[in-house]
Structure formats: C-alpha cells, structure tokens
Amino acid sequence: VIDDYAERWALVTGASSGIGAEFARMLAARGMHLILTARREDLLKELATDLDTRHGTRTEIIVCDLSEPGEPKRLFDEIAAKGIQVELLINNAGFGFVGTIDETDAERMQQMLRLNIAALTELTYLYLPGMSERGHGGIINVASVAAFQPVAYMPVYSAGKAYVLHFSEALWAEAREKGVTVVGLCPGTTETEFFDVAGVSNWLK
C-alpha cells in the first residue's frame, strides 16, 4: 500500500506516539510528505523535527481531538485550505480500557466510540471519493487482533475493532476497481501507551 507514494501526502491520525509515530517514521523514510495530527502538540513538534532532520520531510502539524464531534470535518477542511491533496490516509487514532460494562463510565465509552469508530468512518467518507475520482489512493484503518473474537472486559473495544475490520474489508471490495486500496491492519500486542491508558500496563510484563 505504501510503496508508490513518494513525494505525495499522507495523513496520520494519532501520530504523537506508538503505532502512529512509527507509521510517520516509515513513510518519511520512503519520501512521503506528512500531515500529523493528535492532541499533544509538543510530541507532534518533536516528531516533526526529528523527521525533518533525518529525512528532510515536509510536515504539517494539526492539533485535533478526533473524539470531539465536528473535529474530523474541521481537520479535513483545514488540510484542504492548505491546498494539500491527501493520497494516503492512516486512520490510527484510538484507545481502549478494561472493565465490565456496568463499571464503565458512560461518557468515556461514548468518547471511545466516537474516536475508534465514528471519526475513522467520517475521515474515510471524506477522503475516499477524491481518491476514487483520481483513480489512486490508499487507506489503512488500524483495527486489532481483538477484532477476531469477543473480548471479555473489553466488550465495546473489541466490538468496535470488529467494525473497523469489516468496514475495511467491505471497502476494499468496493474501492479496488477505482484504483484505491483499503486495508484493515490488525496488530497484536504492541508496546505502546495504549496499555497505560487502558490501565493494564502490567499485561506487557
């Protein structure tokens, strides 16, 4: 998916750390220009400086909380206003937490659904038509191995990742004839801040 995009623009969500930051490093090494978005401006600036030093990467930073309604469209509009054409979309932003459904804070659950599902879907909806019209583009939606089975104590998270996987597979079939590649990426256990946020950093030991 990422081998023929040199000198083109990629948008990476959740780019401040973990898998998103690694995607940014990998794409920069392949000669792509990057739009990096996340909530933490300091980490985005640090990453952009490092990529410029190592690869001379053209980088735009947009601070954005995609779990907030309206933010995916604001991000899309701000990028369009810069005259940037996104050829590769990495929908990586997301989080999870552990607990039974009756222990779950309702607002935190809604925040996770908005970020893991709604924002990913909206950004795909916004960018896919342009890619299809141009006959070229790629979308990588980061799911999880949790997509393949129900996970007790993470029921909403695992169900959400199943959505991401099935959504991606369906779009792969729809978009491939238009020159657009859609991939659902399902990482296994990866040492990132995810486990700290989920309150289960001991799982990595």
Task: Name what the model sees in each region.
Residues 100-101, 105-113:
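Substrate-binding pocket helix/loop in short-chain dehydrogenase/reductase
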Residues 124, 160:
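Active-site helix of classical SDR
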Residues 144:
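Residue(s) in the substrate-gating loop at a strand-loop-helix junction
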Residues 166, 172-205:
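SDR active-site lid
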